[in-house]
Every structure is written in C-alpha cells, then in structure tokens.
Amino acid sequence: MVVLDKKLLERLTSRKVPLEELEDMEKRCFLSTFTYQDAFDLGTYIRNAVKENFPEKPVAIDISLPNGHCLFRTVTYGGSALDNDFWIQRKKKTALRFGHSSFYMGCKKGDKTPEEKFFVDSKEYAFHGGAVLIQSERSDYPYACLTISGLKQEEDHLMAVSSLIAFANESLEEDLNLD
C-alpha cells in the first residue's frame, strides 16, 4: 500500500526540498531485476495506488524503455486526454536526457526557461514532475522510465517515487521470503 507523505508533498509544492534530498529519493528508485512481467506488475501496482490516493482522478501511467519501447500504459478513469500522452513524452524525454527525474530538473532549472538553462526546446521537454528513472543497483544506466501525468506535478512526482520505492521494498521482501 502506498501512502503519500503529506508533509513532503507540501514541501515539494513550496519548492522547499533541496536537490540533494530529491536525488536521495531517486537513488531509492531501484529494482534488483526488471522483466516485462515486472513492468506489468509495477504498472498495475501504481494504477491501484493512484486509484486509492486519488479516487476519480484521470491519470495516465507509462513505463517505457530508454529506446522508447512501451512496456505498460494505462489510465485510471475516463477523462484522461491526448494531452496526457504529450506530457508523458516530454517528461520522459527530460528524465532520460538528463538522468534525473523531471521534477528534479524543473527545480534545478529554477526561474530560467529550458532554453536559457539547458539549451533545449520547451516544446520537446517538460520540466514538471512525473517522470522517474527505474534504476538497477548493479548499473549506472536506467532500466526504464516511469511517467505519471494527470495530477498536479508535485503529486505526479511523489506518486511515482513513492510507488516505485514501495514496490521495490515489497519485491525485495518477497525475494527474501524463503518459506
């Protein structure tokens, strides 16, 4: 079960979370393995977590490989729009290019435009929360990118990070259960 930290959400909303703390959260977003079945299980887990935490909110969830191959895609309720797909693409592109969550990069960007800070087109990249890299503890490169769109950007980010960490912890517990 994923329970969002309301105090952390308030801090994210007010931008009172240092980049180092955001990076520490990202470092906890790792899985020991990542198969097609893991992608499906993770996506289903996140869909259920979104439905529990944000009933009746239309949210799009995407898990894709760095090469763009989509392993999982769903929405929670009717009402998501094609615009969510565009947000997913732009957030995912940001996380994969810069190696950090799209929220982290938005905080790092500060008040500058993407063009000023990073020399990228804001029509192609989104510096808003929701895209988080799925990492391996054995590699410097991500397995995939998890992207959520449809909530406020801080909620998208916290839902992605919290769900991924909770899923990883539950998977580890299952792996360690020798019964």
Curated annotation (Swiss-Prot):
One of the GO biological process terms: post-translational protein targeting to endoplasmic reticulum membrane
Compartments where located: Cytoplasm
InterPro entries with a match to the protein in the record: PduO/GlcC-like, PduO/GlcC-like_sf, YBR137W-like
Note: Present with 1200 molecules/cell in log phase SD medium.
Family of the protein in this entry: Belongs to the UPF0303 family.
PANTHER family: PTHR28255, UPF0303 PROTEIN YBR137W
Stated name of the protein: UPF0303 protein YBR137W
Lineage: Eukaryota, Fungi, Dikarya, Ascomycota, Saccharomycotina
